[in-house]
Design a protein with these regions (language model features):
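Short, strongly hydrophobic transmembrane alpha-helices
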Residues: 11-43, 54, 413-437, 448
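Mid-to-C-terminal secondary-structure elements
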Residues: 119-132, 145-276, 472-653
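Membrane-proximal extracellular/periplasmic loop immediately following the first transmembrane helix
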Residues: 33-100, 110, 138, 208, ...
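Intracellular coupling helices
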Residues: 5-21, 25, 297-338, 392-403
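Generic structural signal for small/hydrophobic residues in well-ordered secondary structure
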Residues: 12-15, 22, 43, 59, ...
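Small-residue-rich transmembrane alpha-helices
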Residues: 31, 35-36, 254, 335-395, ...
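Short juxtamembrane loops and helix-capping segments at transmembrane helix boundaries
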Residues: 39-53, 197-206, 246-248, 267-272, ...
Length: 657
């Protein structure tokens, strides 16, 4: 068989360009397919890493118009204790965010800014925390906390983290203590679970115990029998006195299985819940499969093109005594090796560029063997025609002269080439449409100006003690035009904060953003009726509301109308702007189109985000350095992370891109 291989190598040398292009095509196709398959498998098995996933449910509230996952603490506690079918429950505050910690003392003091989640101790009984050291029961002690392994190694190195102290230099929301002792270290969670790798510590036993207005908590329950979930909700809905609580008049409960949360598109509007688009994932997987199909067809055409050049030597070997089965086996083996070589190179590329794959390179067996199966199928299909056709022609016909493809073989090649070009053109057109959609999302007008505006989050110390000092020093700097404040980054997240008010005897709902009086003018948001807030409005005792145009159409509001907000403040409509989008366009067809947007002005509101507008032509590097140094001077615990408003969309749609 050496002559067959020698002839094959000679043929490859003669067709270097074609052989190289085929290998490159298969490598790229397999690499793309496996990278998409890794993501698809990760999403398909989302949250299934937890052994009790089928019995874990999240408590949701539903009305005739909407559904949401956040709960009032006493309401969640009432539900968790309402049925013997609920074996365990946990209540989580996902809003704490990052907290500035210091470790050590005096000269060897080190600082870190790490995410914190407060919760009730039942979380370790519901979810699978894989203990590395310490004890999971440490959450029963309000002084202790759980750390992910990566964080423990980053902070404490290879030494044991158990018993080490973390001192918070700022308040931890929903917790009374600032000093935490590491009681346990758990193995990091993968990306495909709702639980984040954060510092877990117990929720304060007195926080929000009697607060029936604070919808900030998530509640998960563990059931003994998942089939009883509807009965549990039905019994609770009948027994609980909803009518006694103004905020619960139209509410009913619903349990959502943990594994179903990821693809619940109606939950995309909250950033602390991981979500995905199944349709988008399926389309991406289908596209990657088509790319592999194109590469395989190209491979088949290549092997068919080699038939006339190899058929004579193949049949000479048959005359010399090689059996047809043996010849066909080796021809198929060549195709298999060709495909497997391409697949092996694609795996090496995945290892080299693992950082480019969402969630890192975690190839499960099903993905590896799926790709291997496709490579074997490619070899089988590509080797079928040469193996069968080239060995079935009578030797006397072949040895009498040159030989080409039969009319059927030529028609087959023409059909394959035609199909290949058709699929390629379809993919190119689809890619152009997808690119256009992404560009539309990224360039979508949010209704406000974002040029030369940098946003930085301030810690509580600066917000409460040094805000005036911070503001005056910024306004006195030559490269800064003005500074305003808001409760969040406008247009930077999928989340909208919902509010409600009593107006003319009816309840109206809207999304809102707390802002300083000069925020709208700084962001170039103008009023087309009434006016926007001004600096002197900061002294006003009532809340001043500036709505977008949807409020006029849907709520029949007018300038000067007064209302009572659900959080207890008197409010007055100051004016109306054009339509403004304060969150992403992910949900533009649903939630953003449903409710109007209000900018709420009152200086007493908590607004940790500073919007700093730079002068045209200002040296951004020098300005940011000045701000950083000033923040470090005012509060060493503030670790500023600057972001320009015009970059929000790039980060927001990173997954689509």
């Amino acid at each position: 068989m050496n002559s067959i291989y020698r002839n094959f190598i000679i043929t490859l040398k003669v067709n270097k360009m074609a052989a190289t292009l085929n290998i490159c095509g298969l490598v790229i196709a397999f690499t793309l397919f496996d990278s998409v398959a890794i993501r698809t498998e990760s999403e398909r098995t989302f949250d299934k890493i937890h052994s009790k996933a089928e019995a874990i449910y999240r408590l949701d509230c539903v009305t005739s118009k909407s559904q949401w996952p956040t709960q009032i603490l006493p309401f969640a506690q009432a539900f968790a204790s309402s049925s013997p079918h609920i074996l365990e429950s946990t209540i989580i505050n996902p809003y704490v965010g990052e907290v500035y910690f210091t470790i050590g003392r005096d000269e060897i003091l080190k600082d870190y800014k790490e995410p914190v989640i407060t919760c009730t101790p039942g979380i370790v009984s519901i979810f699978d925390f894989q203990l590395v050291e310490g004890s999971l029961d440490c959450l029963d002690d309000p002084e202790k906390c759980l750390l992910p392994e990566s964080m423990a190694r980053k902070i404490f190195g290879e030494s044991s983290a158990i018993g080490k102290e973390l001192l918070a230099e700022e308040e931890i929301w929903s917790k009374e203590r600032k000093s935490l002792v590491v009681g346990g270290v758990y193995k990091d969670f993968p990306e495909n679970t709702q639980l984040n790798n954060a510092i877990y510590t117990s929720l304060s036993s007195t926080y929000c115990m009697d607060d029936w207005d604070n919808w900030i908590f998530l509640c998960y329950v563990l059931l003994d029998d998942p089939s009883q979930k509807d009965l549990i909700c039905s019994q609770f809905n009948q027994a609980f006195p909803f009518k006694q609580y103004e905020r619960l008049q139209e509410v009913q409960t619903r349990l959502v299985n943990l594994c179903d949360i990821y693809y619940m598109n109606d939950m995309n509007s909250v950033t602390y819940i991981k979500s995905g688009n199944k349709r988008q994932t399926d389309l991406l997987f289908s596209a990657s499969f088509l790319v592999v199909l194109i590469a395989v067809i190209n491979f088949i055409n290549f092997t068919m093109a080699l038939v006339p050049a190899r058929i004579k030597s193949i049949n000479i070997r048959k005359i010399l005594g090689d059996s047809v089965r043996r010849l066909r086996g080796f021809l198929w083996l060549e195709s298999f090796l060709f495909a497997l070589l391409s697949y092996a190179i694609s795996l090496l590329l995945l290892l080299v560029y693992e950082g480019c794959i969402g969630g890192g390179f975690h190839m499960k067996g099903i993905v590896f063997f799926g790709g291997l199966f496709m490579a074997l199928c490619a070899g089988l299909l590509a080797g079928a025609y040469p193996a069968i056709y080239a060995t079935s022609i009578p030797q006397r016909i072949v040895l009498n002269g040159s030989f080409g493809l039969s009319p059927k073989g030529k028609r087959m090649r023409e059909c394959l080439v035609g199909f290949q070009y058709t699929v390629s053109i379809i993919l190119i057109v689809l890619s152009l449409f997808i690119y256009k959609q992404i560009e539309t999302m990224r360039s979508h007008s949010f209704g406000f100006g974002n040029d030369n505006v940098v946003v930085v989050e301030l810690n509580k110390e600066i917000t409460e003690k040094y805000k005036e000092n911070f503001t005056n020093r910024l306004r006195g700097y030559a490269g800064i035009e003005d500074v305003a404040f808001a409760a969040s980054k406008i247009g930077a997240t999928n989340e909208n904060r919902g509010g409600a008010a009593e107006f003319n005897g009816e309840t109206i709902y809207f999304y809102y953003l707390n802002v300083s009086p000069n925020f709208l003018s700084l962001m170039d948001i103008t009023a087309n009726e009434g006016r926007v807030s001004r600096m002197e409005d900061g002294r006003n005792k009532e809340l001043l509301l500036v709505f977008d145009q949807k409020a006029k159409r849907q709520l029949n509001l007018h300038v000067g109308d007064r209302m009572k907000t659900f959080w207890g403040n008197d409010a007055r409509v100051l004016g109306f702007t054009d339509e403004v989008v304060i969150a992403s366009t992910h949900k533009a067809s649903e939630s953003l189109a449903t409710y109007p947007v209000a900018f709420v002005t009152n200086e007493e509101l908590y607004m940790p985000y500073a919007y700093i507008k730079l002068m045209p032509g200002a040296d951004k590097g020098n300005v940011l350095l000045y701000i950083r140094n000033m923040l470090n001077e005012l509060s060493p615990s503030c670790l500023p992370d600057f972001e320009f408003c015009d970059t929000f969309s790039r980060h927001l749609y990173e997954k689509e891109i």
